[in-house]
From Swiss-Prot:
Top-level taxon: Bacteria
Native species: Pseudomonas putida (strain GB-1)
Classification via InterPro entries: Glu-Q_tRNA(Asp)_Synthase (IPR022380), Glu/Gln-tRNA-synth (IPR000924), Glu/Gln-tRNA-synth_Ib_cat-dom (IPR020058), GluQ/Sye (IPR049940), Rossmann-like_a/b/a_fold (IPR014729)
One MF annotation (Gene Ontology) recorded for this entry: glutamate-tRNA ligase activity
Name of this chain's protein: Glutamyl-Q tRNA(Asp) synthetase
Motif ('HIGH' region) on chain: 12-22
Keyword Aminoacyl-tRNA synthetase: yes
Protein family membership: Belongs to the class-I aminoacyl-tRNA synthetase family. GluQ subfamily.
Positions bound to L-glutamate: 9-13, 45, 172, 190
Assigned GO CC terms: cytosol
Annotated EC: 6.1.1.-
Residue numbers covered by motif 'KMSKS' region: 228-232
Amino acid sequence: MTNSSYIGRFAPTPSGFLHFGSLVAALASWLDARAVNGRWLLRMEDTDPPREMPGARDAILQTLERYGLEWDGEVVFQSQRHDAYAAVVDRLFNMGLAYACICSRKQLEGYNGIYPGLCRNAGHAREGAAIRLRVPELIYRFTDRVQGEYQQHLGREVGDFVIQRRDGLYAYQLAVVLDDAWQGVTDIVRGADLLDNTPRQLYLQELLGFSQPRYLHIPLIVQPDGHKLGKSYRSPPLQVEHATPLLLRALRALGQDTDPELLVATPAEVLAVARKQWRPEAIAQKTTVPEADLR
């Protein structure tokens, strides 16, 4: 890939403040783009207003700026892209590739998250229903730049999946595929918790005629109880005054060498060195890293 053709992105959800796990993901994405003089875009995945936290959008932008992770172009907000999502849902539904589903959560208990196709041929009206995409009985596979080959049988391991919820909100799988294609994203660097989402996205890309980006899934930082760092587990928000030591810690989480002398450097100086020395092949080929190992 030539320097000018790389387009990466970071796409946080404004349901809370950025935490250390967010920093590791943002830093990996930023470095992978900047190391080849590529572009790095910022997209706010704000498709679920009930989960949004007041003030989180601005706080995320300010934190990234203070940590030196500057982006290219305007910030894209998924909440302003509903017309594009609606057009594709309509198209898929009218082509018979998607259908209305009125199954409740209670009805789906016991299926281990794999949709059994209860509404597949029922012909329900769209009003008040979720919209599911029909999946083929095929294996989708790709080679991740860190995790190696990954494959998933969509029919057996996932089942027909939701692209629009019953409340009218658009599902992550649909929005992320449409926005990555619209923005011309060539490389996706994100947490390994999304590894098993990727085959669904590959299918949507194929269905809609989009190019497949390269993927790099980094290990998640996990707490002693095995849960990933996240807003739902009250992970502490990033502190601006600790930017340099936290950047160095994030680099260690990504398997990168760090110089102790950089502890007295500015965030910009840390990033300048890290950008020159970026080695994605040094990232551990595993899906989790205990936070305690990074101290």
